Amino acid sequence: MNHLQQRQLFLENLLVGVNNMFHQMQKRPVNTCCRSLQKILDHLILLQTIHSPAFRLDQMQLRQMQTLACLWIHQYNHDHQVTLGAIKWISPLIKELK
């Protein structure tokens, strides 16, 4: 398996794991999902430092993961303040949710 195939497999597995966790948001409190998401994001950051360049996600891909997380939280939580707090926790660069 060449580097491009390995990278594609890695990204697909990562997306499946993140997507599976978000589907559980209907069954679990938002705070639990936020903690799980934070672990995933921490793991992504760790992978950035230990993997060869073929496996590293670029800034755009990391940002897409954060955006996906924020969209899922917003979709499954109807309390605006809790949603905003969760999103700020995951992605501190987001100033406000409109």
UniProtKB/Swiss-Prot annotation:
Protein's cellular compartments: Host cytoplasm; Host mitochondrion
Record's signal peptide: none
Q: Name one Pfam family in it.
A: Rota_NS6
At the top level, the lineage of the source is Viruses
One term under GO cellular component: host cell mitochondrion
Q: Which InterPro entries match?
A: Rotavirus_NSP6
Sorted alphabetically, which keywords does the UniProt record give?
A: Host cytoplasm, Host mitochondrion
**Keyword hit for Methyltransferase:** no
User: Assembly state and interactors?
Assistant: Interacts with NSP2 and NSP5.
Question: What's this protein's family per the entry?
Answer: Belongs to the rotavirus A NSP6 family.
Protein name (database record): Non-structural protein 6
